[in-house]
Design a protein with these regions (language model features):
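Active-site glycine-centered loops adjacent to acidic/histidine catalytic or metal-binding residues
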Residues: 190
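Conserved cytosolic headpiece of P-type ATPases
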Residues: 10-14, 174, 187
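Subtilisin-like serine protease catalytic core
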Residues: 1-137, 151-154, 166, 179-180, ...
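Short, well-structured alpha-helical segments in soluble
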Residues: 140-152
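Charged helix-capping and loop-helix junction motifs
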Residues: 169-172
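Generic hydrophobic/aromatic pocket-lining and core-packing "Φ" positions
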Residues: 145, 175, 197-198
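Hydrophobic beta-strand scaffold residues
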Residues: 182-186
């Protein structure tokens, strides 16, 4: 996640839109157990009352040294290399009224679906250098899911494709346990039509 994005600021200006130095507009959440783990390009102070947690998982890969040996461009932190985690987090829970930048600037201001939601990032995938894709190990994905539940999240947004072959893989089982703990799981189902079939809804 890119914590400097106004989508994740906990402050608002006089117009009610997110700013870096306005009035604090979020309060602490009772019962929250998450942490803000510092690392490369990410300090503990990058978290706030909107971005309330940031952790990264790579033990199944062999730890940070193993990831760095294979993907030296990556950030050994919750910082996003290819932008996917930032995009999906801001789409789900980014602040209201944030001025879009880059090619999206034509849209003016943007908002997440649940703009008052808090965000906790659990990074378990590591990007290719061209930022076209990312990969990781199932053990790290499961560790991230389980940690999110233990930390006290209400919703897990899992925007990492899907499976057509194995509905009982370890990540799916972790989602069942998350649901049993009262956590709503929103998981993508992939971006390709199954056997060239598509729905015409």
């Amino acid at each position: 996640i890119w914590p400097e994005s106004l989508s994740f600021s906990d402050r608002t200006g006089a117009n009610g839109n997110a700013t870096k130095d306005g009035k604090l507009s979020y309060v602490r959440i009772p019962g929250w157990h998450g942490r803000c783990v510092p690392g490369e390009g990410f300090t503990a102070t990058d978290c706030n009352q909107k971005l309330i947690g940031a952790q990264f998982f790579n033990a199944s890969w062999g730890g940070s040294a193993a990831v760095e040996a294979e993907r030296p461009w990556e950030f050994m932190s919750a910082r996003d290399y290819n932008g996917h985690g930032t995009h999906t987090s801001s789409t789900a829970g980014g602040n209201h009224g944030v001025v879009a930048t880059g090619p999206a600037a034509v849209f003016g201001s943007i908002s997440g679906m649940a703009p008052r939601a808090r965000i906790a990032m659990y990074k378990a995938l590591w990007s290719t250098e061209d930022a076209s894709t990312a990969s990781g190990f199932t053990g790290d994905l499961v560790a991230a899911i389980d940690q999110a539940v233990a930390d006290g999240v209400d919703v897990i947004n899992y925007s990492i494709s899907g499976t057509l072959t194995n509905f009982a893989d370890p990540a799916e089982i972790s989602f069942l346990f998350a649901a049993a703990a009262g956590v709503f799981v929103s998981a993508s189902a992939g971006k390709s039509a199954w056997r060239n079939l598509s729905s015409r809804l």
